[in-house]
Amino acid sequence: MFLRLIQRTLELGRRALVLVPEISLTPQMIRRLKSTFGSRLAVQHSALNNTERLLQWRMIQQGNADIVVGTRSAVFAPLQNLGLIIMDEEQEHTYQSESAPRFDAHDVAKKRAVMENALLLFASATPLTETYHAAESGKLQLVQLTHRYGGRPLPSVDFIDMRAELAAGNPREVSVRLARELQENLDNGEQSILLLNRRGYRTIGMCTTCGHVLKCPNCSVPLVYHKPQQALLCHHCGHTVHPLPQTCPECGGKISYSGFGTQRVEEELAELLPGARILELAELLPGARILRMDQDSTSRKDAHETMLAQFARHEYDILLGTQMVAKGLDFEKVTLVGVLGIDSLLFGQGFRAYESVFSLITQVVGRGGRAALPGRALIQTTVPDHPVLQLAAAQDYKGFYREEITFRRFSLYPPFCSFVVVGFIGDQEGAVFIAAQRFGALLGQHAAQKPNIPLRILGPAPMNITMLNNKFRYKLTLKCRNDAAFRALLHETLDAYDAEKLPQKASVILDFNSDGDL
């Protein structure tokens, strides 16, 4: 469908912009487009160095590119005569920038489409609830593909109850059945994908005597054990503790490391990347060639493209990774998908938690059985009867949407209101809290003079990560109608806050289309 739309756009003498949520998806997309449309194609994403980015930008600016492919920043590419914008996997949160300049690629794409009279396509098997609601309401045109590409059946999905595994004496993170089916795939010369959305080896270090948890001194989060470095690492600020602590800094008791991440599961499966062998589970999968793909293993330039090409050439049997392995990848020999550790996401914070889990499972399950061989998926969980997991296993998006839209309507969440977070960041926790409190009071006072503006002010409250990079963080959550009148109200309040003579102020950050945190 994408190729036909792009072909028609080029025939009309116009140009096309294709957005993808992850850098890892650009190589496959580029190969497909170049094989069909030739080399007049430019790329925009953060993995390019400054020289490469400038050359690609000039190529676009000078009119030498008919198609641009890239991640969210590509939405600003200076394409002239733009006729088509495709946002693939539009449900992904990576389309929203979390650092300055803050923007949502959805909003920028909509604005460009209107300004340039271009067609905008939001593509997804699991659209955002707001997007599908807009289509149901007639604000967007809904086009549904009722058959899987190539006419292949959907993979079969089974659940593995990890409570039963533990009761049966299996302490491993990989269940007996998953290990058995991985071995069957190895014997049959087929490939497997395993999803585990946690990096590192062990996810928490805790004292067995007093219960003290080893946390980052700069951020209010536990440090994560990374075995190759024999160190604890903060995934937010990069703080490192080396050598690995064995005794509690509070009471001198023994530190125990628990939980599991991709490094731990990789060790349980067989070998590390080429040149480093892991023996922990050689008895389970002797001879297995395992490729780990997460933020740690893909930090090198071109690592995504190199690793995916290696997997496509069947240099590896198992692709193990975080959520980057769930999206848009297409390997004909992948017949088994395993999902591990999904419960931590299922019970995560934010009103989009269920939506994220449903999308993630649906996407990763769809990576299997995409060619001649049928696919199957195994989901490890302690709550196999959870309705979100059951709906995801059945690939029942409409069923999930009905449940989700009912919850959103009852609880007044988007699309039935706009969700805006006003963040406050500073050096002194007390001062940050007072700043948030004062801003909320000012906003309430100004809003009281404009009763026609619907507004609910929640907070102040600490953010999910209260301290980040030695800065304390609090928030106000606003349920509102994000129109010109509301934005004018915010500007008035910001001006009034700026005029206040508080002893210590905090930086203020506005985050529109938020899921409830920064």
Model segments located where?
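Short, loop-centered acidic/histidine patches that primarily coordinate divalent metals
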Residues: T477-R481, N513
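C-terminal effector/interaction modules appended to NTPase cores
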Residues: N469-K471
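Short beta-strand elements
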Residues: L291, H446-M463, Q504-N513
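Inter-lobe coupling/hinge segments of SF2-like helicase ATPases
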Residues: M1-F433, Q445, M463-T466, K475-L476, ...
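Solvent-exposed amphipathic alpha-helical surface segments
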Residues: T36, H446, K450, Y497-E500
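Generic C-terminus detector
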Residues: H491, D495-L518
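Short amphipathic alpha-helices in soluble, non-transmembrane regions
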Residues: A435-A441, A488-A496
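Short amphipathic alpha-helix segments
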Residues: K398, F433-L458
